[in-house]
Amino acid sequence: MTDTDRLLSAGRRAEDVDAALRPRSLDEFVGQQAARDNLRVFIEAARQRGDALDHVLFFGPPGLGKTTLAQIIAKEMGAGFRATSGPVIAKSGDLAALLTNLEDGDVLFIDEIHRLQPQVEEVLYPAMEDRALDLMIGEGPSARSVRIDLPRFTLVGATTRQGLITTPLRDRFGIPIRLQFYTVEELERVVSRAARLLDLPIASDGAMEIARRARGTPRIAGRLLRRVRDFAHVLGADIVDAKVADQSLNRLEVDNLGLDAMDRRYLHMIADIYRGGPVGVETLAAGLSEPRDTIEDVIEPYLIQLGLIARTARGRCLNGRGWKHLGLNPPPEAGQDGLFDV
């Protein structure tokens, strides 16, 4: 199973792209209060100066609204919006074509910007700093450098792996913004808003039940809401309340902490086979038949956030909360090093 096959994957799927549900302004956008407040100031200041907004870098876990915020920036600035992704820009010529087709003030959004090729980054540096392209025309002794002026534009980059962005590129973003996981209360508002736009009657306790299991991620909350809607229609429920939501999510094997079968396999492997750990990530990856990157970037962050596991120098260990969630008692020696205190 790949990560995108999981119902609780925060990665983007075609079914998640619903323009009708997407917030269109900072006022409609739920959560990320500090980021929204700062963006509102930066956008208003740029408008008053009659200038383009400084380049923006959004970083944080997937599914938190980086693409949506980029589109909102363009709308609030009254600018055009162009979107692409790092892997798509294979050659420097591809980037040059994108940049030369921008209109004055446009927003260029590059998702997965950490995956840009080094030669493409070299073209991006003068474009970001000087609004110019330095291109080599011709080959050999007759080759010459030509500088092409570009219109004012705002580059909005998005990444889930900030550490993989090179320092020269990262330093050229004037507005770096980290997006955080959502609280359950914020996700309840996201679910209620989406249900209203889908014409789906939902009780506050039903929205809260979905929010609790959405792993702090609006994209997952929206996906769970759609699946709960399917169950509600088939069951003939007039309204999605806590009972309907709980029954539906249990059928989907999403437990009360928002863990799915893959998460529980991971926890059970540490508990049942390695007596709570420590166990190395390569061993876990082999046992689960998953790449190491999937373990480190997809499975573990949420488990660490919940305090179910700990990453130590010796490997991964199950914490007290992890044992409790599995309904198991730790072996006698497990509590001696203090790793398993709740």
Curated annotation (Swiss-Prot):
Q: What segment(s) does the record annotate as region Large ATPase domain (RuvB-L)? A: 4-182
Record has Cell division as a keyword: no
Choose one Gene Ontology CC annotation of this protein and give it: cytoplasm
Q: Taxonomic lineage per UniProt?
A: Bacteria, Pseudomonadati, Pseudomonadota, Alphaproteobacteria, Sphingomonadales
What is the catalytic activity of this protein? ATP + H2O = ADP + phosphate + H(+)
Region of interest (Small ATPAse domain (RuvB-S)), residue spans = 183-253
Q: What is known of its domains?
A: Has 3 domains, the large (RuvB-L) and small ATPase (RuvB-S) domains and the C-terminal head (RuvB-H) domain. The head domain binds DNA, while the ATPase domains jointly bind ATP, ADP or are empty depending on the state of the subunit in the translocation cycle. During a single DNA translocation step the structure of each domain remains the same, but their relative positions change.
Subunit text: Homohexamer. Forms an RuvA(8)-RuvB(12)-Holliday junction (HJ) complex. HJ DNA is sandwiched between 2 RuvA tetramers; dsDNA enters through RuvA and exits via RuvB. An RuvB hexamer assembles on each DNA strand where it exits the tetramer. Each RuvB hexamer is contacted by two RuvA subunits (via domain III) on 2 adjacent RuvB subunits; this complex drives branch migration. In the full resolvosome a probable DNA-RuvA(4)-RuvB(12)-RuvC(2) complex forms which resolves the HJ.
Write the gene name: ruvB
Principal location listed in the UniProt entry: cytoplasm
Which GO MF terms does the UniProt record name?
A: ATP binding; ATP hydrolysis activity; four-way junction DNA binding; four-way junction helicase activity
Q: Which HAMAP family match?
A: DNA_HJ_migration_RuvB
According to UniProt, the name of this protein is: Holliday junction branch migration complex subunit RuvB
Query: Head domain (RuvB-H): where is this region?
Result: 256-342
Matching entries from SUPFAM superfamilies are given as:
P-loop containing nucleoside triphosphate hydrolases, Winged helix' DNA-binding domain
